[in-house]
Design a protein with these regions (language model features):
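Helical cap/lid subdomain of alpha/beta-hydrolase-fold lipid enzymes
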Residues: 42-195
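N-terminal non-catalytic accessory region
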Residues: 1-69, 189-191
Length: 195
């Protein structure tokens, strides 16, 4: 949230605009809400659109965190390795999953109310089946057991927030996964070198 605040101020200074419109994905939506509500940035933000942000927490996380803590820590360390491969320089999956429980997000929501001068909207996405995205195969199955349809990490129930715009399923047989939402695979395959 602090990095986002600095980035917003840099953009406003560079462009001389009065406000920004923010589109935030996943936990970035919570960071943006915190920045707006708790870091005094409401006057600089016209709108916040959140894409699969866990506003209401994950029932799946509530259940997973009932497992023995050693298993959770091992799983989190393995996830950290994966996130490093994907480009996160300093992942802390164990800390993050504890922030995504329904209890933690309820407290977060109580402390970070919407600001009346900012327009908020939220969007949910779902995969059509576990084979829709091989990287989200296992998480999709696990989340499905506890919460039904999901994007590989979050069920629509978790992402609903102010001005909820609905569940997007895509036109293909695949649906839309948590990674598709940020075009992760295409970005990696289409990056150019040498310029």
């Amino acid at each position: 949230a602090y990095v986002l605040k600095d980035t917003v101020m840099d953009i406003l200074n560079e462009t001389k605009a009065d406000k920004v419109n923010i589109i935030a994905h996943s936990k970035g939506g919570l960071d943006a809400r915190y920045m707006i509500s708790s870091l005094g940035m409401a006057e600089y933000v016209a709108s916040l659109s959140t894409i699969s942000t866990p506003h209401n927490g994950s029932i799946t996380m509530d259940n997973i965190l009932k497992l023995p803590n050693i298993l959770i820590k091992i799983g989190a360390k393995l996830a950290d390795v994966w996130f490093k491969i994907l480009g996160d320089e300093n992942p802390d999956t164990y800390k993050v999953i504890n922030q995504f429980t329904t209890i933690a997000t309820k407290k977060f929501n109580e402390n970070n109310k919407d600001c009346s001068n900012v327009y908020y909207q939220s969007f949910a996405f779902v995969m059509k089946n576990p084979l829709s995205d091989f990287l989200m195969f296992l998480p999709n199955i696990i989340v499905s057991l506890f919460e039904g349809e999901n994007d590989g990490l979050l069920a629509p129930r978790a992402t609903k927030w102010t001005n909820f715009r609905g569940i997007y399923r895509g036109n293909s047989k695949r649906g839309i996964s948590h990674l598709d939402e940020v075009d992760l695979r295409r970005y990696k395959l289409s990056s150019q070198r040498g310029d």
